């Protein structure tokens, strides 16, 4: 019986499709439950003011452009530092998908289920970083074996 090759990263196409859906979901949740106040955050306000954006859904292309730059820079660093020659960009994109999925799940739990264990999204940042690093290390180990 032939052993199938294990995929540890998403393809670029699927990663981008999922990221687009997650960004639109995040923006939609902000519009529905917070009336667009997410654009008033310290990070997004200067960007929104620069482009004159008042609706979070209209910020989607800017966020996706930012993700594109992060994916390219992260893939370049993975190739240079970690010596991952294949699937470096897919690794970064999959990490973004996992981290953003956890963030969106937290948003859904806060808005729909009144989840208050983590009262502020800033407290979630270290947790998301740990999740991203843990997946990155695991996937990198698997990719180097392949």
Protein language model regions, located:
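Hydrophobic alpha-helical segments at protein termini of multi-pass membrane proteins
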Residues: 2-146
């Amino acid at each position: 019986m032939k052993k199938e090759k294990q995929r540890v990263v998403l393809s670029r196409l699927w990663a981008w499709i999922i990221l687009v859906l997650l960004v639109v979901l995040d923006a939609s949740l902000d519009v529905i439950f917070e009336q667009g106040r997410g654009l008033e955050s310290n990070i997004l306000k200067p960007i929104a003011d620069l482009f004159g954006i008042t609706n979070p859904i209209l910020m989607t292309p800017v966020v996706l452009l930012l993700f594109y730059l992060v994916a390219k820079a992260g893939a370049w660093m993975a190739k240079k530092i970690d010596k991952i020659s294949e699937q470096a960009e897919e690794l970064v994109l999959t990490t973004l998908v996992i981290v953003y999925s956890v963030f969106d799940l937290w948003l859904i739990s806060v808005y729909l289920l009144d989840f208050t264990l983590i009262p502020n999204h800033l407290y979630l940042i270290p947790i998301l970083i740990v999740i991203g690093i843990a997946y990155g290390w695991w996937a990198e180990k698997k990719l180097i074996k392949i």
